[in-house]
Amino acid sequence: MKTIEIGNKAEEQASKFLRTKNLQILAQNFKAFPYGEIDIIALDQNTLVFIEVKYRSKTKFAKAEEMLTYSKQQKLINAANIFLQENPKFENYECRFDLIAINKEDINWIKNAFILN
């Protein structure tokens, strides 16, 4: 299976998981040039959640949780700002950055994976 197919499968698995937790999926693979994309954008009651999905099939060297770098966090923040500019109806919502880490078949949902400085 190609890397992009694996990533898409992991993101779909994460979306299904989030729906079981009563989150409303607003967007998947939101493109925010030049910062890349946000894997999933969802509503958790009145909180707008920007979610990065990381998948690792092997955890011998590193777990998925360890793959969210500072650089990636900055790109997510910038991409979230673009989403908010394009969708002003969400400008007064609380915002949160979460991580869905999938290690093999285990899903770990880390709310507030990082905060704005």
Swiss-Prot record:
<dbReference type="InterPro" id="IPR003509">
    <property type="entry name" value="UPF0102_YraN-like"/>
</dbReference>
<dbReference type="GO" id="GO:0003676">
    <property type="term" value="F:nucleic acid binding"/>
</dbReference>
<dbReference type="InterPro" id="IPR011856">
    <property type="entry name" value="tRNA_endonuc-like_dom_sf"/>
</dbReference>
<comment type="similarity">
    <text>Belongs to the UPF0102 family.</text>
</comment>
<dbReference type="Pfam" id="PF02021">
    <property type="entry name" value="UPF0102"/>
</dbReference>
<protein>
    <recommendedName>
        <fullName>UPF0102 protein Fphi_0415</fullName>
    </recommendedName>
</protein>
<dbReference type="InterPro" id="IPR011335">
    <property type="entry name" value="Restrct_endonuc-II-like"/>
</dbReference>
